[in-house]
Amino acid sequence: MKHLAIVIALGALLMLCCNCSFMDKMYAAQKIDQAATPVPFTTLENYFVRNDVDCSKQQRLIIDNKADFERFFGMAAHMGGMPTEVNWNKQFIIALVMPETNRATSIYPVAVKTTDNNCLVFSYQVKKGDKLSHTMVPFTAVAVNKPETRQEMQIFFLEK
C-alpha cells in the first residue's frame, strides 16, 4: 500500500512537471496579450485541410511559403467564393488545425498582437456544437504582414 502511494505521488509530480512548460507558456501568452499592440490580419476563407494531413492531434502552424501551405491546405472555391489570396512576398500564415471530430466545431480568430520584443500572440475562440453524422477537421488560418526586421519572432497561441 505504501509503495502504491509513492508511485501515485511520483506520477502526479511527473504530470505536474510536464504541464509546467505548457502553463508557463499560457501565462506568458496572457501577459503578452495584455500589453501588446493589435496587428492587422486577414482571415483565410475557402480553404480546407487536405485529407493526407495527420489530424490526430492539434497542430499550430507558421507558414511562410506557398509550397508548405499547399502541403496542408487545398482550395475550396466551390464552397462559396474564391479562396483568399496570400501575398507570399509580404505575408505569412498563422494556422491552427484541431483534431478530426464528429462535432460541429468552429474556430474564430480574435486578434493578433505584437510587442516590442518580437513576440506575437494569436488569440482565437473555439465553439463546439452538435454531433455530426460525419467527421470534420476544424481549422482557422490568418495572413499577417511579415515583420520588417528579420529577427526571430516568438509566436504564442492563446485560446480565449
Name what the model sees in each region:
Residues I8-C17:
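Bacterial N-terminal signal peptides
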